[in-house]
Amino acid sequence: MLSDIEIAGAATLRPITEVATESLGIGAEHLVPYGHYKAKVGITYLNSLADRPLGRLILVTALSPTPPGEGKTTTSVGLTDALHGLGKRAIACLREPSMGPVFGLKGGAAGGGYSQVVPMTDINLHFTGDFAAIAAANNLLAALIDNHVHHGNELDIDVRSVTWKRVLDTNDRALREVVVGLGGPPNGFPRQDGFDIVVASELMAIFCLTESWADLKRRIGDIVIGYSRAGAPVTARDLGADGAMAVLLRDAIAPNLVQTLEGAPALVHGGPFANIAHGCSSVMATRAGLRLADYVVTEAGFGADLGAEKFIDIKCRMSGMRPDVAVVVATVRALKYHGGVALADLDREDLGAVEAGMDNLRRHLDNLRHLNGVPCVVAVNRFPTDTDLEVVRVVELAASYGVPAYQATHFTDGGIGAQDLAKGVLQALEEPARDEFSFTYPDELSLTEKVEAVATRVYGAGQVTWDGKARKRLARIERDGYGTLPVCVAKTQYSFSTDPGLLGAPTGHELRVREVRLSAGAGFVVVICGDMMTMPGLPTRPAATRIDLADDGTIIGLS
């Protein structure tokens, strides 16, 4: 089989104006083209759609992933193509890839095989410049903080309390902790600082949760960058940074329109990680999709304990959206991995391991159905090494839980390989809801109680423990009036626990909170657990070493 980049390179793409006009009814005058195959959809035009009825929202999530990944984006694209092939007006709403994983371990995030969004190389690299705009706005605020201190510190900022970090879209562990302002008085006031990856930043979260230009500026102004020496919060608005930062993001918050390999429309916009951020594409893009199409397929990062929980408890809570059905992606190899099989042996048939690994899938299904009231369908994303017996067993066991499951071969077959899944999703959408939609916790709980609710109800933890510094920070956040905000838990994606090696569906484990960060502009509190880092490092053999540029300008090795 051809590689992802070879498949994408051989595709014949429709002009983006044609995709917009024929698939979505958007006139060319409402697009801001970035070449022939990608464009931003004008915000003024999107605002004019406010009275249109909303389509149905399909959330694609997964069981706890294995290191190679289970294909949520690929399934989202394949399902969109399948719905499109069935004559439905469907659109995908996906996250933009970060160049950190592209050049690191995971690789790109534009789908795979014959279920990709294109132009794949553009999307995986600079795309329309959204991440660069976010980084510029973020780092402008960092510069204004240090400049304010250098020129007299009128706000009396306690430099030891500054929490705002610089960012870049690269995995670079050497920049996690740095000292700035060295070299004497002309270079500013020396202080400890650090870098986060763009997709873990508060500004990325603001970008993805904002609903308008006014909302963008308000949220940016609400950012708390640190505290005065008297203990009062200091905001971006206090520094006069909100206007300039909003200007840098004015055009970027317009959703990006591209297409799948089969010509279906896709809005690819925003890209927070789900393990160290809230893991969902932008509200602007999702709401646009719901007004432009009858069916919106969107994905939330990693397993349902991370991306789907945050989709529901953060994105839905703030936007008022509700998923009509969740498609939970499972693979035979992931089930065997959670059933105790080593990575090197996942290609061997093992029905016993498949059955043991179903505990992990079942907990995700139970959480979505019974805790949040979201109907579920299982997509068995089939790999060539899966046997018929293994796939049939997954379908049987899911059915025994009361959840329909469908084999999908969209990676190798494109949209036609996901048509059974699409028909199953359409059927699920026609059935009356059995449970009422609900959040994992109400707003009025304390921050401690909210973390405990996620830990015990979603993760199956027995207790939550707090490092002393984290507990003090939490108390200060509540004292400053932010106790009603939702929580965004940052933890490993590989387990319900904070131990990536604790697979399956563990119970009674301890959730250790190491650090707490206030994201007042985004509107949530980040709770960092275990050993999670908000600036990843590169692996022993980075993907960057396999990517090259041919003499004719062709990009090689991007996946």
Swiss-Prot record:
ATP binds at T66, P67, P68, G69, E70, G71, K72, T73. Pathway: One-carbon metabolism; tetrahydrofolate interconversion. It is an enzyme of class 6 (ligase). Coiled coil: none annotated. It catalyses: (6S)-5,6,7,8-tetrahydrofolate + formate + ATP = (6R)-10-formyltetrahydrofolate + ADP + phosphate. PROSITE patterns: FTHFS_1, FTHFS_2. Keywords: ATP-binding, Ligase, Nucleotide-binding, One-carbon metabolism. SUPFAM superfamilies: P-loop containing nucleoside triphosphate hydrolases. It comes from the Bacteria. The keyword Nucleotide-binding applies. Its EC number is 6.3.4.3. GO terms for biological process: tetrahydrofolate interconversion. The keyword Metal-binding does not apply. InterPro entries: Formate_THF_ligase, Formate_THF_ligase_CS, P-loop_NTPase. GO terms for molecular function: ATP binding; formate-tetrahydrofolate ligase activity. Belongs to the formate--tetrahydrofolate ligase family. This is Formate--tetrahydrofolate ligase. It comes from Nocardioides sp. (strain ATCC BAA-499 / JS614).
